[in-house]
Swiss-Prot record:
Catalyzes the NADPH-dependent reduction of L-glutamate 5-phosphate into L-glutamate 5-semialdehyde and phosphate. The product spontaneously undergoes cyclization to form 1-pyrroline-5-carboxylate. It is found in: Cytoplasm. Its EC number is 1.2.1.41. Pathway: Amino-acid biosynthesis; L-proline biosynthesis; L-glutamate 5-semialdehyde from L-glutamate: step 2/2. The lineage of its organism: Bacteria, Pseudomonadati, Pseudomonadota, Gammaproteobacteria, Cellvibrionales. Pfam families: Aldedh. This is Gamma-glutamyl phosphate reductase. The keyword Oxidoreductase applies.
Length: 418
């Protein structure tokens, strides 16, 4: 069978399964999620073995450390998959929810009903836990899904896929509601993103080159973000202890993720008070610092930042630092260099905080909090299927509601239009 024929087969099966999922009750979907969690738990040793196999192959093939980090199913990440499934099962089901119901002068009653998107294609690299995150959210929101993980995680994903299929079938839902592409041929991606007759939306998760290619070539809608160039701004009215903890956590909690801070902006009036302390803490964690001229005047032993540093998502222990005059200058820098993902201000000034929130045009804007909170789990969405920096359909972490749309519904009692 050719790759095209194989993908067409997956598409047909997904479209048929989407009709079954549309009819599935909330109880059916919740029981499926719990059954999948039980199957993942029962097969923990096998999944970890397959993940170790992928890691070994990745090291042999020269995968970068950031990619290997995303590939590894640590005990905490494994437990997180199971917790995520159970949490999504406990979330309210958005499907069938009716809102804005009102009577019109004609006598008809008009409202909106939340409904699944249909078939969601998800393309991602490295992280095998995305297989579970995506499956759980698509199932609970009534969608069928086709998952195309990276070739580097093929064995992990296949092991997880067997658990998903077993969980679905155990409660009478079709195994084809969640299908994992089992070929590593890159042509499968090209087929998936152009099957407009079967796939309603594509969610790509990966590097910039992957997402740009999908955005350019797809014949269906795409929910995406290109980069995670996230900023923390330490205002001159900041509590410096809060600022220290937020700036340290935003960068060093985990490097290879899109909500890690990549650029630190510091008001000039507090720069000499906070930067030396932060530099010592970053040095203890082996973070390379790259600063502007004003930063170098305070921290002469760090590297000079180049123009491209302000536009780089490092996904590594590297941090760019710029000293700015005030909040206006910080917002100007963010407007010029941000990827519209997440920005945070540290300040005790309520007026400034509200202004920053109103004028910074990113998917998540925070006050006195680490950028690492820009996550569907932390926002109470359960697992997230991705983060969107687009402004239409979904924005920010995409959870259950982001995987649905609304249709108009009309109730009448024999009314006709005169």
């Amino acid at each position: 069978m050719t790759v095209k024929d194989y993908m067409q087969q997956l598409g047909r099966q997904a479209r048929a399964a989407s009709r079954d999922m549309l009819a599935a009750s909330t109880d059916d979907k919740n029981r499926a999620l719990v059954a999948i969690a039980d199957a993942i738990t029962a097969n923990r040793e096998l999944i970890i073995q397959e993940n170790a196999r992928d890691l070994e192959n990745g090291r042999a093939n020269g995968l970068e450390p950031a990619m290997l980090d995303r590939l590894e199913l640590t005990p905490a990440r494994f437990d997180g998959m199971i917790e995520g499934l159970r949490q999504v099962a406990a979330l309210p089901d958005p499907c069938g929810e009716i809102s804005d119901l009102k009577y019109r002068p004609s006598g008809i009653q008009v409202g909106k009903m939340r409904v699944p998107l249909g078939v969601v294609g998800i393309i991602y690299e490295s992280r095998p836990n995305v297989t579970i995150d995506a499956a759980s959210l698509c199932l609970k929101s009534g969608n069928a899904t086709i998952l195309r993980g990276g070739s580097e995680a093929i064995h992990s994903n296949q092991a997880i896929a067997k658990c998903i299929a077993a969980g679905l079938e155990s409660v009478g839902l079709p195994a084809s509601a969640v299908q994992v592409v089992e070929t590593t041929d890159r042509a499968a991606v090209g087929e998936l993103i152009t099957m407009a007759e079967y796939v309603d939306v594509i969610v790509p998760r990966g590097g910039r080159s992957l997402i740009e290619r999908i955005s350019n070539d797809a014949k269906v809608s795409v929910i995406k973000h290109l980069d995670g160039i996230c900023h923390v701004f330490i205002d001159d009215d900041a509590d410096l202890d809060k600022a220290f903890n937020i700036a340290l956590n935003s960068k060093t909690h985990r490097y290879g993720v899109c909500n890690a801070m990549e650029t630190l902006l510091v008001a000039s009036s507090v720069a000499e008070k906070i930067l030396p302390r932060l530099a010592t803490a970053y040095a203890e964690k082996s973070v390379e610092l790259r600063g502007c001229d004003r930063t170098l005047a305070i921290l002469p032993n760090i590297n000079a930042a180049k123009p491209e540093d302000w536009d780089t998502e490092y996904l590594a222990p590297i941090l760019a630092i710029r000293v700015v005059d005030d909040m206006t200058a910080a917002m100007d820098h963010i407007a010029a260099h941000s990827s519209a993902h997440t920005e945070s201000i540290v300040t005790e000034n309520y007026t400034k905080a509200r202004k920053f929130m109103a004028l910074v045009d990113s998917a998540s804007v925070m006050v006195n909090a680490s950028t690492r909170f820009a996550d569907g789990f932390q926002y109470g969405l359960g697992a997230e299927i991705g983060i969107s920096t687009d402004k239409i359909h979904a924005r920010g972490p995409v959870g259950l509601e982001g995987l649905t749309s609304q249709k108009w519904i009309v109730f009448g009692d024999g009314e006709i239009l005169n």
